């Protein structure tokens, strides 16, 4: 009996479908596995799990409780301005300066680092080693001001307790408060995010000036909200007013500023940002560098400048960029 082409096609169709489905499944599996391995490698999850399971004697052997240390302050105490720059690291500098770019995105910060004291692990502009538990903003703040990583789960009682935020920790803010300093921290976002307000209220009795405070004090309109709250251009202008007021108090002050415009993934383009680079994020970084430099120049023109120490640090590395150099 003769068979037409249609009969042959009908008989072969199921096998072709199985072959096609098998290939699609295999490709899908490779894509999923590849994406998973990329994420594990790029976000250093393997290292995180390894470090969490490993027990060391670091604190037993090296940690010094600041409560037990006698600190001697000079009779004329120096003021402190500490600027936390969101996601800023030396990878944005030119390779010639120790960075990862052909051309520096932040030449002003490069110049400030070279003209002043720069803590580095080599002869160029280096960086600190970012440990587990210091890789996001509040964790970095705890790490820099208390000397410990923030390894407590977000849902733990000690993390969310509004009246008992790590009561056993003794921080820089508490040391300064004990020695007569006025502490203030300013940010253009909501300080309740990440329990930042809990940390600073309970460790140094900081006056917290954030987005909510700016609305309450009439510095911005009630319906004003860009990016995370208000932009860094306003932050530096508000900081000038508050620092001027603090300087007239007759007491030493510690002012901490927390920028936000360079937050990932693309940052916030304010009216002062230029469009020099193809990448929006690169343009925002360049804008931040100019803003910080302008603020420093303003500080230099103030009568209190000679008795003030200004510290500029990145809060943490940019997690979306994988660079083999861990100290950046």
Role assignments for model-derived ranges:
Residues 13-29:
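Membrane-interfacial entry segments at the cytosolic side of transmembrane helices
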Residues 115, 244-250, 297-307, 328:
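Secondary-structure transition/capping motifs at alpha-helix termini
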Residues 28-78, 82, 89-253, 260-276, ...:
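Active-site-proximal alpha/beta segments of enzymes that process anionic O-linked groups
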Residues 1, 62-66, 293-296:
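Short, motif-level signal for alpha-helix interfacial/capping segments enriched in acidic residues
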Residues 201, 258-265, 311-320:
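Acidic helix/loop microenvironments that form the catalytic cleft of cell-wall polysaccharide enzymes
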Residues 1-12, 325-327:
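Short, small-residue-biased leader/transition segments that mark boundaries at the very start
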Residues 291-324:
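Metal-dependent active-site segment of extracytoplasmic phospho-/sulfohydrolases and closely related
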């Amino acid at each position: 009996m003769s068979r037409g082409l249609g009969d042959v096609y009908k008989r072969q169709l199921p096998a072709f479908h199985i072959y096609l489905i098998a290939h699609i499944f295999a490709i899908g599996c490779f894509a999923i596995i590849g994406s998973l391995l990329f994420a594990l490698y790029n976000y250093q999850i393997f290292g995180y799990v390894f470090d969490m399971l490993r027990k060391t004697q670091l604190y037993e052997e090296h940690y010094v409780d600041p409560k037990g240390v006698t600190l001697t302050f000079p009779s004329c105490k120096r003021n402190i301005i500490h600027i936390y720059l969101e996601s800023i690291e030396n990878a944005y500098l030119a390779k010639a300066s120790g960075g990862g770019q052909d051309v520096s995105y932040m030449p002003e910060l490069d110049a400030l680092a070279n003209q002043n004291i720069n803590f580095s692990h080599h002869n160029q502009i280096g960086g600190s080693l970012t440990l587990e538990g210091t890789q996001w903003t509040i964790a970095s703040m705890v790490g820099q001001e208390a000397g410990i990583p923030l390894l407590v789960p977000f849902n733990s009682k000690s993390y969310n307790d509004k009246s008992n935020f790590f009561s056993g920790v003794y921080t820089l803010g508490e040391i300064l408060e004990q020695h007569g300093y006025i502490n203030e921290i300013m940010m253009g976002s909501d300080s309740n995010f990440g329990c930042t307000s809990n940390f600073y209220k309970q460790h140094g009795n900081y006056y917290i000036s954030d987005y909510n405070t700016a609305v309450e004090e009439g510095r911005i309109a009630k319906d004003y909200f860009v990016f995370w709250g208000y932009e860094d251009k306003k932050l530096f202008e508000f900081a000038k007013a508050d620092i001027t007021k603090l300087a007239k108090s007759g007491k030493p002050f510690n002012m901490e500023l927390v920028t936000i415009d360079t937050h990932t993934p693309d940052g916030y383009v304010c009216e002062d940002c230029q469009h020099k680079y193809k990448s929006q994020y690169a343009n925002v970084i360049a804008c931040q560098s100019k803003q910080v430099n302008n603020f420093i120049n303003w500080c230099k023109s103030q009568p209190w400048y000679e008795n003030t120490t200004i510290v500029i640090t990145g809060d943490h590395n940019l997690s979306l960029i994988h660079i083999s150099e861990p100290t950046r």
